[in-house]
Structure formats: structure tokens, C-alpha cells
Amino acid sequence: MAEQYADKQIKLFSLTANREIAEKISQASGIPLGKMSSRQFSDGEIMINIEETVRGDDIYIIQSTSFPVNDNLWELLIMIDACKRASANTVNIVVPYFGYSRQDRIAASREPITAKLVANMLVKAGVDRVLTLDLHAVQVQGFFDIPVDNLFTVPLFAEHYNQLGLSGEDVVVVSPKNSGIKRARSLAEYLDSPIAIIDYAQDDSEREEGYIIGEVEGKKAIIIDDILNTGKTFAEAAKILERGGATEIYAVASHGLFAGGAADILESAPIREIIVTDSVLSKERIPSNIKYLTASHLIADAIIRIHERKPLSPLFSYRSDKKD
């Protein structure tokens, strides 16, 4: 655990979505978690009570807006309001997983842009700054009229794979869809490895028609995506890579949601190991081949840098020498 942080005017509070990562962030930063309570009435209404003064303090509220996304979002909004009404100096939110970020555009007629709606609600509630981790769409930052710091997890993953010796020309980094090329290229640059892409002849409903752009035969493949939801994308990509001659298949994602029967799907896929961060505390069954890498040190460093008005740019080539 880090030494206690000297400045007493910064306070961390954890809401209920992911208490585990909040405790790790507290330990890594040396800032104790503040005292507060959150409960639901029988009709589902949320009630929050901050059990210590926050007057004049810089507040950081830690809350992933994962499942149940609406409960977690409303709990966050209510906590923001409570801090503002208690005369906090600034209210900053730490959202390791930002729910609704996939609804960032109008993909079909008469659809909403819900990511923008959520941004509006947070700003209206009184947020001064947002700190998040691997937004699904980086343009969501532009939906806010306040600073949004979007940390990247690729350096953490690269460190893990370099330690395993998974680097160089005998490894290929694979994007399981053409929209993820930039992410795959970023990891490939850290590993000095080539990239490949899995594309599809038609739309996503014809997954069995997938084909590989790039060379995977005789190589160890690492599939990378930002969100692991049902596991179907990873499982289908792994089968295509196996048919393409990949010798070993690994997978990595920033956020592990594990919705529905993801565990069964992933355990039956030819994937040796799946890496995710601890941004989401899933209540679903977790596949046996999952390994968690903590993002808590990265987030803790960012919080301290923001509070001390230091640049965050060193964190974008982040290397952690700390263990889970």
C-alpha cells in the first residue's frame, strides 16, 4: 500500500458497482475511501448519505456504469448532486467502464444518441471532470463540455504479453472486426508483431463467412477488442484463426461484461487465455481461462496527477512494476 497521501482536501468515494477496484485505487494512491452509504427503498429509489464533511474538498467518485447500468448511473448522478449540495470544491467522476458509450451515433433512422444524453446528464448534475478507461468510441469525449481523460490499457496488456515472451514476428495481433484495426495496431507496435483482421463477406449475421486479412498460419494469435460482452465475437474469431493455422490463440479486452452465457461460449472456444482489466465486477459466471489485470495503479496515478495539476501524457506509455 502506498504511503498516505499528504493533501487532506482530496477525497475518494466508492459507490456500489465495483467496490473492489475502488479499494485497490485507494491503496495505490494512499487516499482512504470516504464514508458514505447508499441504499435502495422497496420501490427502487436510491438514497445516498455522505457521512463526513466534503466542504471545500476535491471529490473523486468511483463508479463503473456496468450492469445494472441504469441503477449504477442513477446512483452516480445522485452522489454527484449530494456532493454539490454539500459544497464540495470540485466533483470528479472516475468511471472505469462507461456504459452507453456504444450508443455514440445514429446507426438507423430515429435512433437516439444516448452517449450524448448521458454526458448531458452528468454535466448538468455538476461534474467538473471525467476520468475513464478505454472508451468504446473516443469521440464520446467530445460530447462533454468539460475535461474528459480517457486512459488506455494497451500498454498494460503489452507488458503482460512481453513477460510471457509473446512478441516478435511469430506472434500476430488480430482485430476480430474491421472497426478495431487501430487498437490492434497499437498493441502490435508494442510487441513488434504484425497484425491481421477478420472481416466478413456480408453483415454480422453471417459470422461463419468470416475470412482473415493477413498471415496467421504457424503464428501465435492475440485477439484484441475493447468490450467482451457475450463472448461470441472472440469465440467465432478464434475458430476462424484455428482454421487458418494459428498455433496458439489468446484474447484480450479492456472490459469484461460476460453477459448471458459468455462463460460457456468462451470455455468451448479454442482460446488458451483471456485477459481483461478489473474495470467491471461481473456478477455472471466467469470463464475458467480468464485472467484479470488490475487497472487500479494506472487510475490512481491519473487521479494524483490531475489533483497536482501534472500532465497525464506519461501514462499513455504506462508501465507498472506493481502486482495485483
From Swiss-Prot:
One of its GO terms (cellular component) is cytoplasm. Homohexamer. D-ribose 5-phosphate binds at D225, N229, T230, G231, K232, T233. This is Putative ribose-phosphate pyrophosphokinase 2. Keywords: ATP-binding, Cytoplasm, Kinase, Magnesium, Metal-binding, Nucleotide biosynthesis, Nucleotide-binding, Transferase. It is found in: Cytoplasm. It is an enzyme of class 2 (transferase). Involved in the biosynthesis of the central metabolite phospho-alpha-D-ribosyl-1-pyrophosphate (PRPP) via the transfer of pyrophosphoryl group from ATP to 1-hydroxyl of ribose-5-phosphate (Rib-5-P). It catalyses: D-ribose 5-phosphate + ATP = 5-phospho-alpha-D-ribose 1-diphosphate + AMP + H(+). InterPro entries: PRib_PP_synth_CS, Pribosyltran_N, PRibTrfase_dom, PRTase-like, Rib-P_diPkinase, Rib-P_diPkinase_bac. The gene is prs2. Its cofactor is Mg(2+). Mg(2+) binds at H136. One of its GO terms (biological process) is purine nucleotide biosynthetic process. Belongs to the ribose-phosphate pyrophosphokinase family. Class I subfamily. Binds 1 Mg(2+) ion per subunit. It comes from Streptococcus agalactiae serotype V (strain ATCC BAA-611 / 2603 V/R).
